[in-house]
């Protein structure tokens, strides 16, 4: 009986070890693997220019000022590159609500139209924060995809008055 048990254990160990050895992925080139992210676009905040990065560690911090003169200003010059994770600290120095939204130019136009149809709708999503006067909000963003990025305030009339900032990564 003991011999049979030892034989079963030895065979199980041999088969398990051989199977585990065949599952070695250390030599796989993961960077060359095609990955279809197109289905991820349905996730809140997903964009052609990147995605929300809650919980990620930012490698850059950008202080943003939203003002009633309809400007989006970065407090300091900053170079954002593809794959950067950026923490945006967004301050509204004005007396009216403003929005800070990240996306492509096409996405911003769609967002603007949605805001126009819904009236003065305030909301926060993975790619957008609405900031009350005198308040500050943060947005953590991972840049990837299209390298032409547009920041905008899509509250009706604001972008049309100049509250848009475009950059190229």
Curated annotation (Swiss-Prot):
Induction: Induced by copper via the HTH-type transcriptional regulator CueR under aerobic and anaerobic conditions. Expressed under both aerobic and microaerobic conditions, the amount increasing with increasing copper concentration. Nevertheless, under low copper stress, expression is much lower under aerobiosis than under microaerobiosis. Cu(2+) binds at residues 98, 153, 158, 163. Residues 1-20 form the signal peptide. Keywords: Copper, Metal-binding, Periplasm, Signal. The keyword ATP-binding does not apply. Disulfide bonds: none annotated. It is found in: Periplasm. Disruption phenotype: Mutant shows decreased copper tolerance under aerobic growth. The keyword Metal-binding applies. InterPro entries: Cu-binding_ET, Cupredoxin. GO terms for cellular component: periplasmic space. Its main location: periplasm. One of its GO terms (molecular function) is metal ion binding. It comes from the Bacteria. Belongs to the CopI family. Involved in copper tolerance. Mediates copper tolerance in aerobiosis. May also mediate tolerance under anaerobiosis. Not required for virulence or colonization in the mouse model. This is Copper-resistant cuproprotein CopI. It comes from Vibrio cholerae serotype O1 (strain ATCC 39315 / El Tor Inaba N16961).
């Amino acid at each position: 009986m003991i011999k049979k048990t030892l034989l079963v254990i030895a065979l199980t160990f041999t088969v398990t070890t051989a199977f585990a050895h065949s599952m070695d992925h250390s030599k796989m080139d993961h960077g060359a693997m095609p990955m279809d992210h197109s289905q991820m676009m349905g996730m809140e905040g997903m964009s052609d220019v990147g995605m929300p990065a809650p919980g990620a560690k930012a490698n850059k911090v950008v202080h943003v000022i939203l003002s009633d003169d309809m400007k989006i200003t970065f407090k300091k010059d900053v170079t954002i590159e593809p794959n950067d994770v950026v923490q945006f600290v967004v301050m509204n120095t004005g007396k009216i609500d403003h929005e800070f939204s990240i996306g492509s130019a096409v996405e911003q136009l769609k967002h603007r139209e949605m805001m126009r149809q819904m009236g003065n709708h305030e909301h926060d999503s993975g790619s957008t924060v609405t900031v009350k006067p005198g308040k500050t909000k943060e947005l953590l963003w991972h840049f990837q995809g299209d390298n032409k990025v547009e920041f905008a305030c899509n509250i009706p009339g604001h972008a049309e008055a100049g509250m848009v900032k475009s950059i190229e990564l």
